[in-house]
A protein has these predicted regions:
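Outer-membrane beta-barrel porins/channels
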Residues: 1-274
Length: 274
């Protein structure tokens, strides 16, 4: 809403990325497989907020495209155990677009670097019907400290968004039960550490540590493909915020409060091999 109490900090925050990722895999031997991919990514971003004075609100919009890469390895330690490692590179963008108010539109640009991620995963066949899996992931969110918006014409900074993110990690464990040759039941839990802190938390991303609870199933139709369906409940710790935004000397806005968030996620996937 344009009229909520924190509108001077944020009204709308939207980032959309699309990733095209052709990849190659090489089976070195029965124990080791390697993979390598190239990523071409597009990004579109929009941020709006209220501003003091006659303009009432401002809008920042920008887009760009860039390249990255990813690599991985899978080690078959035994017929009942596999270990995988993977890495996805950071991606650098220079967003270009406009800063808009009711009366003006200024060409702007901003550099942003989305983080690199490393994942270690383990799969274990426990019995004929049970299998267990887990993973530990590290994301280098420290690449995102400030989003400095510059005039494309003069190079002068005309705005800034502070994030102050730190690296974050996630640990997950799950299991699957093979009820029949066609049906499997899956469940899992994960702890996801936030990259922000109480001192840096913003109204744009009022994030905190998260716990995931998930439940799902798979139907294997053989030549007809596979259908997966799942549900996840996402619990977030209450997130306190104390953010002051400076518009000009002596002109500030402060938001103090607490966020209470949760989410319900449903997903369906169909896959087939040729």
């Amino acid at each position: 809403s344009n009229n909520w109490i924190g509108s001077y900090q944020a009204i709308k925050s939207e980032i959309t990325t699309v990733n095209y990722n052709p990849s190659l895999a090489w089976k070195v031997n029965d124990k080791v497989s390697l993979g390598l991919g190239i990523s071409y990514q597009t990004i579109d971003a929009e941020m709006t907020s209220a501003v003091p004075g006659p303009f009432s609100s401002s809008q920042l919009k920008g887009d760009d495209s860039s390249w990255g890469w990813n690599a991985g390895a899978l080690f078959t330690l035994s017929p009942a155990m596999r270990v995988g490692i993977s890495y996805r590179s950071a991606v650098d963008y220079t967003l270009e677009g406009n800063a808009n108010t009711a009366l003006t539109s200024t060409p702007v640009k901003a550099d942003v670097k989305l983080p690199d991620t490393a994942i270690l995963s383990v799969w274990q066949q426990v019995s004929d019907r049970w299998e267990a899996m887990g993973d530990l992931s590290y994301t280098n969110w420290s690449t995102l400290q400030n989003l400095n918006v510059l005039s494309s014409n003069t190079g002068v900074q005309i705005g800034s968004e502070h994030f102050g993110y730190k690296y974050a990690w996630r640990i997950a464990w799950g299991a699957a039960y093979k009820a029949t040759d066609a049906w499997r039941v899956k469940f899992g839990i994960a702890y996801d550490k936030t990259p922000t802190s109480n001192s840096d938390r913003s109204a744009r991303v009022p994030d905190n540590d998260r716990i995931w609870f998930s439940l799902g199933g798979q139907w294997n139709g053989g030549v007809y493909g596979k259908v997966d369906a799942g549900y996840a409940y996402l619990y977030l710790k209450d997130a306190d915020i104390n953010q002051t935004k400076v518009f000009a000397p002596g002109v500030t806005s402060t938001l103090r409060g607490s966020y209470n968030d949760s989410a319900h996620i449903l997903g369906v996937q169909y896959s087939n091999g040729f």
